[in-house]
A protein has these predicted regions:
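N-terminal signal-anchor transmembrane alpha helix
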Residues: 2-25
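Hydrophobic alpha-helical membrane segments
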Residues: 85-100, 119-125
Length: 134
């Protein structure tokens, strides 16, 4: 049993669940097609559809990585556990880098990075994943 990987996986799965439900209710449903631009793929409704699909693809990515971390820390053993743990730690790092990087790029102050839990949760998940994988 690898406690850091289990914690990282549990955190990622919890985050995926929150991303799915809160994102659907608080973000996607509130997008008004009338306020969205058209794209070369179609009108505002198609833009909303693409945002909706991308949102839930991201949720599935979080769930997949979380499941891999959880399995690596609990059920899998040896080289298989290490390899999958390293891959999932790398993916977790990518998620954290995007959240922190884009958050910092658009932040008006360092404090605004703390308004949304994603940068901190994704960074904690990545740190736990690397701790457990190495």
């Amino acid at each position: 049993m690898n406690v850091p990987l289990i914690l990282a996986g549990s955190l990622a799965i919890l985050g995926a669940g929150i991303h799915w439900v809160a994102g659907e209710v608080l973000v996607v449903r509130k997008l008004s097609p009338g306020m969205l631009p058209s794209s070369r793929f179609g009108g505002p409704v198609m833009t909303k559809t693409m945002i909706h699909a991308a949102w839930h693809m991201t949720t599935i990515a979080f769930l997949t990585v979380g499941s891999a971390l959880l399995l690596s820390g609990s059920v899998l053993h040896g080289d298989m556990a290490r390899g999958i743990g390293l891959l999932a730690a790398g993916a977790s790092t990518g998620f954290a880098a995007v959240a922190v990087g884009l958050g910092a790029a658009y932040a008006r102050s360092p404090r605004s990075l703390l308004r949304h839990p994603a940068p901190a949760v994704l960074t904690a998940t990545a740190a736990l994943a690397w701790w457990g994988a190495l």
